[in-house]
Amino acid sequence: MDLFQTFQTHNPVIGVVHLLPLPTSARWGGNLTAVIERAEQEATALAAGGVDGIIVENFFDAPFPKQRVDPAVVSAMTLIVDRLQNLVVAPVGINVLRNDAHSALAIASCVGAKFIRVNVLTGVMATDQGLIEGNAHELLRYRRELSSDVAILADVLVKHARPLGTPNLTTAVTDTIERGLADGIILSGWATGSPPNLEDLELATNAAKGTPVFIGSGADEDNIGQLIQAANGVIVASSLKRHGNINEAIDPIRVSAFIEAMAEGLKSKPSKSTVVDAPAGTKSVVC
């Protein structure tokens, strides 16, 4: 994945738009217009603060289905993402929770979004939805069938989950890239708002061998300068909201402060840590 081609920077900050509850979810309020307006406000605030990309998630649809979401969710997210792309110039991505990568890829391919996030691409994770199995085989075939160039960013040992058996981070990273054909990997802490530790990021980056590594949770103005030393980019949500509260709206002032803190951290980052990888879908397979 060529980060500069997608984001116009080798070290992108991707801000998250957490959608209000969508149709058929447990907390759906019956007003899609309100959901759209909130999403537009969030995207505008992120763009005003200077993010390099935006990812849209059905975050407030919890509790999530284990696999496929309802068609109404897909329809709503398609409508919203399309509108956001006409509102901001930053590239937009999609994450359909908990692990509906097929729907995310379909939406992205149809509206021209640039990337998707997949919580479990390979392996098996024990989650609050039950056991979730990665299905890279079907997803990569589906991308080929769609003639799509949407990049796949895959979590490794995803948050709010535990792997079956004894986890090995370097093996999981290698398998996700070489056997799951992920275009980039994401490393998170144990839960939303919890950062990965620096040692794990360094291990992941070394194992990735040039494939982009993103910080997937817990980054804030205080720690991003250190965390970015061992990663290529960051996906950030909680710390950009008013008072750092996940339930509040995006605060463009906090976004700007985060961007500035990361820029300061990048000044001390060795240039060799900047990587540019192959285009989506061109990795070799290890059997």
Swiss-Prot record:
Recorded hits in InterPro entries, A to Z, give: BtpA, RibuloseP-bd_barrel
From which domain of life does this come? Bacteria
Which family does the entry's similarity section mention? Belongs to the BtpA family.
Function of the protein:
Regulates a post-transcriptional process during the life cycle of the PSI protein complex such as (1) translation of the psaAB mRNA, (2) assembly of the PsaA/PsaB polypeptides and their associated cofactors into a functional complex, or (3) degradation of the protein complex.
Name of the protein: Photosystem I biogenesis protein BtpA
